[in-house]
Each structure stands twice: as structure tokens, then as C-alpha cells.
Amino acid sequence: NPAILKKLKAINLAENNKFFLWHTWFSDVFNREDKEGFDIVIGNPPYFLYQESHVGEIGDLRSDKDYTIAFGGKLNAYKLFIANAVKKLLSTNGINCFIFQNSFLGDRQATNLRKYILKNDKIVKIDSFPERDSKKKRVFESVKMSVCISLIQNAKVDCDYVFPVYVWDDKYNSS
């Protein structure tokens, strides 16, 4: 139908900030015969709490089953990015490497996300940078934030396993 085709072509997908069409924009990645998804996803997701001004967005996210693991207490954007990467974006055996808030490692509000990762993925390693008071020791000198770097593989692990966690005294020396 030419009229419908004309309307579809008139839609400006770049202006729509409610969703991102991964399968459309990266069809070559998600429509491969041998595997779907990215082999590696690297990022520094934003750290911000969703506030009352984001009520509509929070409702939309809560209704998406892929993001339920990011909820629990206050919703921080970085948790949504992690959930999206581990549930939607990685190919089988793909690797996710993110740098994000160190509080994730012990935060009760991130329990669901940690449980999901431990059950469904393989943690290759975690580097923790707890220093935030000394500017020279921070990973990002201008940001007073403790961070960690996770390396997570989209691979099933059939039994308990050990993964290394390195705690760094500063950005150059681990303890």
C-alpha cells in the first residue's frame, strides 16, 4: 500500500527517544545465521537516579521484562544498561565490559541484577577501584566516584566457579 509506505518513510526514528531499534539499526549483527548479537559490548553507562520527573519512562521500563532485573529500590541508569547488555545485546559467548559504580558489588538494590548475572552468565573478572577521596588515585580524576570494571561473558556455567576480583589501591596498583 503506497499510502502506508509514505507514512512509514515520514517517521523520523532519530527523534524518538522512547526506544532504540537495535534489530533495525544493527540488522547485520542480529540477523546472522551463525549467531545473533554483538561479540563485544564496551561502555561507560551513565550514572543517574531516575526521579519523579521520569515516572512515565519508569513505567515503560517496568513493563519490559528484560529490564525487571534492574529494578529494586532506587533505579539507576547504569543498571538498565547492564541489563540490556546481558539480556539483549550479546551473542553467545560475547563479552560485556563496562565501567560503572562500585556500589553495584554490594548494593542491596542491585541484588536481582547480580543474581541474574551469576546464574546466566560467566563473570570473567572484576576490577574494583574504591578510592574516591584522592583525586590522583581516582580512575576519573574529575569524578568523585568509586568504580569497578566488569568483564562478563554470555556463557552458561554449569557449576560453582571462582572468578578474580582485584581491588586497586589506585588506578595503577592493585592490592
Residue positions per predicted region:
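Basic, amphipathic N-terminal segments
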Residues: 1-17, 31, 35-36, 40
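Signature of N6-adenine DNA methyltransferases within the class I
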Residues: 20-24, 29-175
